[in-house]
């Protein structure tokens, strides 16, 4: 089997023509003959190069409104013929089938059509049949055939042409085959995802959209992102986003999406260390920073309101890795972009996936995303004392934060400001003690604050500790076999408590 192969005949059938002209020009200069259909053939001929119609080869026209163009033995025989098998060569000679050494395909834009909001019929018509078949056939026979399966591979193929002419090595053909199967598997999983709809049982890894990160969680680990970040945000300034940046950005977006009021949050290691809701974005920033000005250093900032100049001036004095906002004033950007490595993101109004995936052991865990947001109607008063209106507002506020904190988690809030939190603790009591200690270290008065827990209290101990600090309103899921002991403590000590019936573990 010859390692190097010269391309003599190319079949070209693409949806997107941009970037193709350089390749066609170079192939023509190398003496390569072209086969094509419809618009692609017209494109090649418009460049001034001859191109044989597939219909002339097969003696069949394009039928069924273009649904069947290349699906014919004279096409696929020329692609799948094994050049080192005499029997294959004899058969294609018998049936006058030309050898095809190169296949260039760019599939119908199925995902773009779905995203455009097109109707079902238009979406179905963008399910490519001939193109995907050509990709699989050419990739299967990579020993003899080169497959360029998407416009993303135009450049690497053009580089080979510029360096070696119309000659490819086995290693190069195998690489293109690998990329081709990545394209076909992603395409098929996208179609499955469309038909699967809200069931969300499709696990898709967008190999063709692989992004190499600086490193993984630590410098000695390699890291990659599979997917399309451009659908979530635009990066308008700063260094390359890292693995850890993405974890924090994801946590920040999940958290800020809980709030409709103007809100600012500061996160470190996926947990909020500062958060507040206020009338203006500047006021929200100041209150969020006051929650923990020490941990804010090197954090990720996120808000659901546009950043103005005054807010940018305040923010600029702090070192932080990333800022996410729906928009920025021109003056604000002039200030924020003074630090060249600072990552500035513009959040897009994109609906986030409804499923979450986590790889472990020898497989993948899949679950529905926790999109539940409790409201006043979900609160059940279990204490004799009723919470005030302000306490209810603060309890719902704190509940949103604790839901997005690592378990075990306790959140203390007051006046729609995160006062302190204890997160990621093996003991709920330790989480509360951590929060109390932090609040005191920054001078907060806990009298009138509320407490939120991500899961039930197995004993009254947390409520007792909080009560002694002046915390007289508590929100929790409830559900412990010893709930009544906790409720009894509340009644004996004038603590208002509501339960939601919904646990919010986060691991």
Task: Show where each model-derived region lies.
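Glycine- and Gly-Pro-enriched alpha-helical subdomains that act as flexible
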Residues: 273-293, 411, 417-463
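Active-site/ligand-binding-proximal alpha/beta "capping" segment
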Residues: 83-132, 136-138, 380, 384-389
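Glycine-rich nucleotide/cofactor/substrate-binding loop typically near the N-terminus or early
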Residues: 39-110
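N-terminal glycine-/serine-/threonine-rich phosphate-binding loop
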Residues: 1-57
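Cysteine/selenocysteine-centered motifs that mediate thiol-based redox chemistry or coordinate metal-sulfur cofactors
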Residues: 301-302, 308-317, 442-483
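Active-site loops and adjacent core secondary-structure elements that bind or stabilize anionic groups
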Residues: 152-160, 165-328, 332-335, 339-369, ...
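C-terminal binding/interaction regions
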Residues: 320-325, 330-342, 464-507
């Amino acid at each position: 089997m010859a390692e190097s192969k010269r391309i003599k005949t190319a079949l070209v059938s693409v949806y997107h023509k941009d970037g193709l002209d350089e390749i066609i020009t170079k192939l023509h200069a190398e003496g390569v003959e072209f086969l094509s259909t419809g618009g692609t053939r017209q494109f090649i001929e418009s460049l001034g190069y001859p191109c044989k119609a597939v219909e002339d080869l097969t003696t069949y026209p394009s039928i069924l409104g273009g649904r069947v163009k290349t699906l014919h033995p004279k096409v696929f025989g020329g692609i799948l013929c094994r050049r080192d098998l005499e029997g294959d060569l004899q058969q294609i000679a018998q049936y006058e089938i030309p050898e095809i050494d190169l296949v260039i395909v760019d599939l119908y834009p199925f995902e773009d059509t779905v995203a455009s909001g097109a109707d079902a019929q238009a979406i179905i018509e963008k399910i490519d049949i001939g193109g995907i078949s050509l990709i699989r056939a050419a990739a299967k026979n990579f020993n003899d055939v080169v497959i360029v399966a998407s416009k993303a591979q135009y450049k690497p193929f053009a580089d080979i042409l510029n360096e070696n002419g119309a000659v490819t090595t086995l290693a190069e053909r195998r690489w293109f085959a690998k990329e081709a199967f990545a394209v076909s598997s992603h395409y098929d999983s996208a179609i499955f995802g469309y038909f699967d709809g809200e069931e969300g049982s499709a696990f898709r890894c967008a190999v063709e959209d692989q992004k190499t990160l600086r490193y993984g969680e630590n410098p000695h680990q390699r890291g990659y992102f599979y997917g399309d970040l451009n659908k979530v945000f635009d990066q308008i300034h700063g260094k390359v986003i890292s693995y850890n940046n993405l974890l924090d950005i994801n946590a920040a977006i999940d958290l800020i999406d809980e709030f409709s009021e103007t809100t600012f949050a500061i996160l470190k290691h996926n947990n909020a260390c500062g958060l507040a809701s206020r009338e203006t974005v500047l006021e929200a920033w100041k209150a969020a920073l006051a929650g923990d000005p020490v941990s804010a250093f090197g954090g990720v900032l996120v808000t659901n309101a546009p950043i103005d100049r005054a807010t940018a001036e305040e923010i600029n004095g702090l070192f932080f890795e990333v800022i996410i906002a729906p928009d920025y004033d021109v003056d604000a950007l002039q200030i924020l972009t003074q630090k060249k490595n600072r990552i500035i993101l513009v959040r897009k109004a994109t609906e986030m996936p409804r499923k979450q995936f986590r790889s472990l052991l020898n497989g993948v865990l899949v679950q529905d995303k926790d999109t539940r947001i409790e409201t006043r109607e979900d609160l059940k008063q279990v204490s004799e004392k009723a919470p005030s209106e302000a306490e209810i507002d603060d309890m719902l506020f704190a509940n949103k934060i604790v839901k997005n904190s690592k378990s075990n988690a306790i959140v203390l809030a007051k006046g729609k400001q995160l006062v302190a939190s204890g997160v990621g603790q093996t003991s709920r009591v330790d989480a509360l003690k951590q929060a109390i200690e932090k609040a005191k270290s920054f001078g907060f008065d806990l009298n009138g604050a509320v407490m939120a827990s991500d899961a039930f209290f197995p004993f009254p101990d947390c409520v007792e500790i909080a009560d002694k600090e002046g915390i007289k309103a508590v929100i929790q899921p409830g559900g412990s076999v010893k709930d009544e002991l906790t409720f009894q403590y509340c009644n004996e000590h004038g603590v208002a408590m509501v339960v939601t019936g919904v646990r919010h573990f986060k691991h």
